Amino acid sequence: MLDLKKKKKVFITGHTGFKGSWLCKLLANAGADVTGYSLNPPTSPSLFEIANIESDVKSVIGDIRDFDSLKKAFDEAQPEIVLHLAAQPIVRDSYKMPAYTYETNVMGTVNILECVRQSNCVKSFLNVTTDKV
């Protein structure tokens, strides 16, 4: 089991989604200091709500396309580890809203990478991507 006794600071984008919610729960239970940045949960009820993830992490509701809001949350968190899960993953939606999908999946990733580039605290970055880029 992952042991984060040193209270590693972790920043997760997409923390209100299915995978992000489970990851938050796992990392918080392992002792990490988790900050999540994401849109509101995509469904209701959602795993995020049912598992009461908000009680385990600092939850920031925001859009990764909004660099200034993302940067503010990122700077406040001062993470050592960044896990980027935020994406628009629905194929049908990508056909209906190609610009939104591009802005979220490509430019949102550019925004989080820019936050990492400008920071002095990040030691590790993981990009979990989708084939909808």
Task: Indicate where each model-derived feature is located.
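N-terminal Rossmann-like NAD(P)+-binding domain of SDR-like oxidoreductases, especially those catalyzing
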Residues: M1-V133
